[in-house]
Structures are given as C-alpha cells and as structure tokens.
C-alpha cells in the first residue's frame, strides 16, 4: 500500500484543512487533515450519520468561529481534536481517525495504517 503525500506542513495552519484521497477496501475515499489548537488531526471525510462528505466539496469543515467541525448537510457537530459528535443526529459517534505522519515539513498518509 502506498504512502500518500498530502502536502507541506505549512499549508495546514490553524483552522485550515487539506483534503486528500486514499484507497480503502478497493474504493477511493477522501480524508482531510487540519490543525486545531496547534495540533494536527485527520479524519475520513464521511459523516457518521449518513455516509456522505462532511463538506460540500469546498474544503469547509470548520464552523464560522473555527471551533467545531460541522457536517454541511445535516448539521452534525464534531470536536476537532477527538472527532466526537457532540450535537446532531449522530451524537456520541466519532469520525474515523486517520493516522498522518509529519516528516521533514511534509505530511504523509500511509494506507497501510488502515489495516
């Protein structure tokens, strides 16, 4: 399974996200990496309420204050640091965490971490 280059660490500033594609179970999927309170996080871009993207394809995951991640379709609210849904139709469920590696100023995702 390949190692996927997401981008430069500098691209993921506080409250910003970068999307990337990966393969799971022979299906192309999308993930996103962001930074909240100085720490990186990465999740599968799939709402836990229904299997749809959290964003509208526009790479907008944070609310207007930059404090929570929001599903743009049904309004489910997730904590950026944990992925836990705190409000909405999937309260108590968590986004699927993706392991991202920061190495020499570059962000990587290793598909082998999915197994």
What are these regions (language model features)?
Residues 87-90, 98:
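Short proline/glycine-enriched turn/loop segments at secondary-structure junctions
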